[in-house]
Amino acid sequence: MNDTVSFGYQDIAPHEKTERVGEVFSKVAAKYDLMNDVMSGGMHRLWKDRFVRRVKPQPDEAILDMAGGTGDIAFRMAARGASVTVADINQEMLDVGVERAMERGIDGLVWSRQNAETLEYPARSFNAYTIVFGIRNVTDIPAALAEAHRVLKHGGRFFCMEFSTTTWPGFKDVYDAYSHRVMPQMGRLIAQDEESYRYLAESIRRFPPMPQFEAMISEAGFANTKVEAIVGGAVAIHSGWKV
């Protein structure tokens, strides 16, 4: 890992990013799902439904949902009968997820505080590994990908949905203006936290483009990697297999 890593548009020490990202999500946890609805116009729900259809959870198979915090993806996969472990480095996000599960009468999920770079699971523990809008916040992405590969069984599936760079002509300017100007102001007005949402917008710009991230997934040992662009590439679903 390099001596510095990105935190939005800043370059900082790796340990500092872990701490500062933790602070961001501790601040936004209570309003995280509401802000997702507001900022995406509810579209994130459709993206997540599409993502889970790609994962194709099977009854009783073991799935690790990393950075799964508030449970949005886990609830969808559990509804299809999968045995889901929700892992997140941030306890406040997990607490929100546990509360949401109780309110919905959803049980059977395992909730665990985990660092994606150093998972506390034996090798070959899971049939599938999912991470949605989380990997760009990881300090050492190659380490997290290596851990995902390690904990998957042979034949296991890796699926990641993350923001990316749009390829639609003219849309990039609109998207940039929205994320840099509107998102932080929404954070200020709704969550009383402009700076956290400024970081979240900036972190999208610093995340590797689709081809580069796909190459990183391959370098971690995954085969048959694919990328599915959504909304002209503003969002992408990455997948790979452990063979």
Write out the residue ranges for each language-model feature.
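A short acidic, Gly/Pro-enriched loop at the edge of an enzyme's catalytic core
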Residues: 117-129
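Conserved class I S-adenosyl-L-methionine
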Residues: 157-187
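A short glycine-rich, Lys/Arg-flanked "PGG" loop and its adjoining helix->strand segment in the class I
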Residues: 142-157
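Class I SAM-dependent methyltransferase SAM/SAH-binding core
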Residues: 62-119
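Core SAM-dependent methyltransferase catalytic element
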Residues: 214, 220-243
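A short SAM/SAH-binding and catalytic strip from SAM-dependent methyltransferases
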Residues: 127-141
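N-terminal auxiliary segments of SAM/dcSAM-dependent transferases
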Residues: 1-23
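Conserved alpha-helix/loop element of class I SAM-dependent methyltransferases that forms part
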Residues: 27, 31-34, 38-61
